[in-house]
């Protein structure tokens, strides 16, 4: 803000012009991942976390949605919310398996409504609440997630209808007259080999 870096509580960290870029060690830690050594090209680092979305609520408090790698066929979605005094970091959904071989941490992704961070949209190939497989293809779900919610208390609504196609990479698009949840639908083999359409639903 105004050329400065701050922690979530407003504590000044440094000035970009005078002090240079922010180092990871200077930033505020929200989640501690694993510290294990390199394993293989087919596995991700232990408990590696990937940020997918960051937005602010009406009070200006940040909310961070991210994925957490546990295994190639077991990833989770988490949401960290600042309440003005502390972070509330919790698991909110099963993210399912990796999208394809050699990219162990690639998920269908999680996103937040830019006007309401409690409105969460995800893509997963398992039941978001139980982790039971859906049949191989990723589907898109949405839910309202309160600060005290976790995987067991959230009610997910499925949005995508096609069981035979991948439904991935959702985003919430807000406009003056219309608001739309969009995602990519089709065949996704790798990040350079895909045949996808952009589809969406108004809400």
Locations of the language-model features?
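Extracellular, repeat-based ectodomains that mediate carbohydrate processing or recognition
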Residues: 1-203
């Amino acid at each position: 803000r105004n050329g400065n870096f701050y922690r979530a509580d407003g504590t000044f960290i440094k000035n970009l012009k005078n002090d240079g870029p922010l180092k990871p060690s200077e930033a505020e830690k929200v989640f501690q991942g694993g510290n294990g050594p390199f394993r293989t090209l087919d596995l991700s680092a232990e408990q590696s976390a990937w940020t997918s979305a960051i937005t602010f609520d009406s009070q200006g408090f940040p909310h961070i949605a991210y994925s957490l790698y546990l295994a190639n066929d077991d990833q989770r979605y988490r949401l960290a919310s600042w309440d003005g005094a502390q972070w509330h970091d919790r698991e909110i959904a099963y993210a399912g398996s990796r999208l394809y071989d050699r990219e162990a941490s690639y998920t269908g992704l999680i996103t937040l409504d830019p006007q309401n961070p409690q409105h969460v949209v995800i893509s997963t190939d398992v039941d978001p609440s139980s982790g039971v497989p859906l049949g191989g293809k990723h589907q898109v779900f949405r839910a309202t997630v309160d600060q005290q919610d976790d995987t067991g208390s959230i009610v997910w609504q499925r949005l995508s209808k096609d069981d035979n196609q991948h439904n991935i990479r959702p985003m919430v698009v807000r406009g003056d007259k219309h608001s739309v949840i969009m995602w990519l639908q089709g065949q996704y083999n790798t990040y350079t080999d895909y045949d996808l359409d952009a589809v969406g639903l108004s809400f």
